Amino acid sequence: MPRVVFIDEQSGEYAVDAQDGQSLMEVATQNGVPGIVAECGGSCVCATCRIEIEDAWVEIVGEANPDENDLLQSTGEPMTAGTRLSCQVFIDPSMDGLIVRVPLPA
């Protein structure tokens, strides 16, 4: 079972177990990680589950798909190679130890 560490600058670290195939949004909301609002429930239409994948994990997690990228760009927030929507990142065994930053609310 992969372990994921969510880091929230206000609340601290949350190290939680995840199931293969779960989205990071599901993992975060099921474990009470603050900052993942997920208003649309994972439909990739609201961008309220925005996260930053730590640099060392970007290649393993992969890039945003075109729809996700368009939605992220529409927010006007600065983006990095690790900017993703947690509803669009699905856990697999290679992600054991994944570190995810949850941005402060705007």
UniProtKB/Swiss-Prot annotation:
Cofactor: [2Fe-2S] cluster
CDD domains: fer2
Binding locations of [2Fe-2S] cluster: 40, 46, 49, 87
Listed Pfam families: Fer2
Entries under SUPFAM superfamilies matching the protein: 2Fe-2S ferredoxin-like (SSF54292)
Family per similarity comment: Belongs to the adrenodoxin/putidaredoxin family.
Keyword terms of this UniProt record: 2Fe-2S, Electron transport, Iron, Iron-sulfur, Metal-binding, Transport
One GO BP: P450-containing electron transport chain
Task of the protein: The oxidation of alpha-terpineol by cytochrome p450-TERP requires the participation of a flavoprotein, terpredoxin reductase, and an iron-sulfur protein, terpredoxin, to mediate the transfer of electrons from NADH to P450 for oxygen activation.
Protein name, entry field: Terpredoxin
Free-text remark on how the cofactor is bound: Binds 1 [2Fe-2S] cluster.
Residue stretches making up the 2Fe-2S ferredoxin-type domain: 2-106
GO cellular component, one term: cytosol
Lineage: superkingdom: Bacteria
InterPro entries the UniProt entry points to: 2Fe-2S_ferredoxin-like_sf, 2Fe-2S_ferredoxin-type, Adrenodoxin-like, Adrenodoxin_Fe-S_BS, Beta-grasp_dom_sf
One annotated GO molecular function: 2 iron, 2 sulfur cluster binding
Protein's organism: Pseudomonas sp
